[in-house]
Amino acid sequence: MAGHSQFKNIMHRKGRQDAVRSKMFSKLAREITVAAKTGLPDPTMNPRLRLAIQNAKAQSMPKDNIERAVKKAAGGDAENYEEVRYEGYGPGGVAVIVEALTDNRNRTASNVRSTFTKAGGALGETGSVSFSFDRVGEITYKLSAGDADKVMEAAIEAGADDVETDEEGHTITCGFEDIGEVSKALEGALGEAETVKAVWKPQNTVPVDEEKAQSLMKLIDNLEDDDDVQNVYSNFEVSDEVLAKLSA
């Protein structure tokens, strides 16, 4: 399992999700507003908005918050957010990609660079690490959607590329350009997905020891704590033994 997925699971087990719920809702609302502003405010006519709302619902974001975020874009009083990607290296030479929605590029770049530096890493140029990742669609379902065989069959029929099933649920990947078509086909076979999004998937992973893993997780935690940062991806991998220690 890639490092950031492991990190998410550890934080979930430690209850971190509850501590950052307000910040998470704020970021989800920002994505909804940007999606509504860049297209039509109707999710049936705006694929990006539909996915943003779907993901917000999956995180139990209140309906009022979702509607308010859409109306903010329709009312024309929304800030002008810009999509920015930062790339760099964390401790141990691990590649890290940071996606942000910001109304001030200088502020965000300064914050992200400082976070990398404090962690013993370095912010690089755009393209410095993304060549070692693939941009893919990721669709997740809870285990209750069906057993591994059922989900695999549905994924093949839908035109997906891969399926991974573990104790957290089913993760289906597909081509970036095929997200809408594949997710729609899966919805017909398995019901509404838990999340549907575009992600950066590492082509290869870098194994790290416990010390490096702790440093990397702190880096990711600090990056995600920035209001402008929407997503963080990395290519490190932790052994089951180290994972058990970090999860304790």
UniProtKB/Swiss-Prot annotation:
SUPFAM superfamilies per UniProt: YebC-like (SSF75625)
A Gene Ontology biological process term: regulation of DNA-templated transcription
NCBIfam families, alphabetized: PRK00110.1 (NF001030), PRK12378.1 (NF009044), YebC/PmpR family DNA-binding transcriptional regulator (TIGR01033)
Annotated protein name in UniProt: Probable transcriptional regulatory protein R02753
GO CC field: cytosol
Pfam families: TACO1_YebC_N, Transcrip_reg
Molecular function, one GO term: DNA binding
Domain of life: Bacteria
InterPro entries: Integrase-like_N, TACO1_YebC-like_2nd/3rd_dom, TACO1_YebC_N, Transcrip_reg_TACO1-like, Transcrip_reg_TACO1-like_dom3, YebC-like
Coiled-coil segments on the chain, per record: none
Keywords noted in UniProt: Cytoplasm, DNA-binding, Transcription, Transcription regulation
Record family assignment: Belongs to the TACO1 family.
Species for this entry: Rhizobium meliloti (strain 1021) (Ensifer meliloti)
Keyword Transcription regulation: yes
Compartments, as annotated in UniProt: Cytoplasm
